[in-house]
Amino acid sequence: MADNKGKTVDQRKICISDYIYDLPDERIAKHPIAQRDACKLLVAGRERGIIADTHFYALPEYLPQDTLLVYNNTRVINARLRFRKVTGALIEVFCLEPVSPADYEICFSGSGPVVWKCLVGNAKKWNEGTPLHGSIAIDGTEICLTAERLEQLPGGEFLIRLSWTGGHSFARVIDAAGEIPIPPYLNRPSETCDSTDYQTVFSRIDGSVAAPTAGLHFTPEVLSALDKKGIERAEVTLHVGAGTFRPVKSECIGEHEMHSETIIVERDLIRRIAELDLSRTLIAVGTTSVRTLESLYHCGCLICQNRWDGVIPQWYAYSDEHPHLSRHDALKCVLDYLDSNNLEHLTAHTRLMIAPTYRYMVVDGMVTNFHQPGSTLLLLVSAMIGDNQWRQVYDYALAHDYRFLSYGDACLFFKDR
């Protein structure tokens, strides 16, 4: 695929070392500031460079009045479960995604046993066939929670069956039994305050093991200001997986296996975007919303080619076989697919890798945080504003006391059409 200067670039040969920058530990925000929307906001565009150094509560001033703002409504679950063996050994079960039932809504609403793909800490001390037991209290009643190790998967994860007494939904059980999983780079244990600090005002659909952190800056006051300006809002669902923290260990990104995440988009929003005038601005809140919306486009292209199997492959966007449909035509294919299958929403698994030279087909800009050096999220940012601009933005932020990563400050980026 050609880059913005017309030169042919092989995305798979992009060196991750070109996306490394020095991030001192003291610049990593360990907690959010007291007033969420008082964090700093750096506004920049691919062509315009740095536009403003301001605060997040001023966000509405920098969005065109015709903006459609799309955010992720996923909610972080208390995914860390700890069990103590009779020998005293501590076993941690980190729930990643449901396997049986695989549907998130059915899994969380059900009261029967569930099977999850999990990471297991201290797994060598837990023999297969030996169940672990723990007790929790729900509404003053003691509940017994049991974990059974079924099998180890090729990637090192385990299939774990969880069952419990009391007839409560799994949503209530994991909420009572688990601990919220904060990012590993915070280098601290989770605290009581994280149960609220690490949820967005949009969160309502259980399923993530990490927060869509760009949404952490929004407050009722910011939402009210957006409403007063007439800015429309809509929601998508991407359940953020632990793979979002997976470092790129290979020198070339072509050797990196992109993690899969589940996306859910309602039919009505797909229709709205398909009918959206191209002159209007669509801003995604967070890289998860970006990935969801762009995956939606590629889903339509796969449907058009009769190749849809429920998964957007990692490198499909760059394939010579890609049909490069217009946004409207691709989303029309998705709508036709939903109609023919009598579905009200699209559920898919995306492995989409957004890297430099990627052509954004749905979003015009995004609200996001400052990301880890050498991460796939930084590649996504570079794809939007360019290599020179992301470095200029990050250098400026480091020189002007911006706070980085999940609990840090925010950016508003435009791809500048």
Identify the function of each model-found stretch.
Residues A2-R417:
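Surface-exposed, charge/polar-rich loops and edge strands
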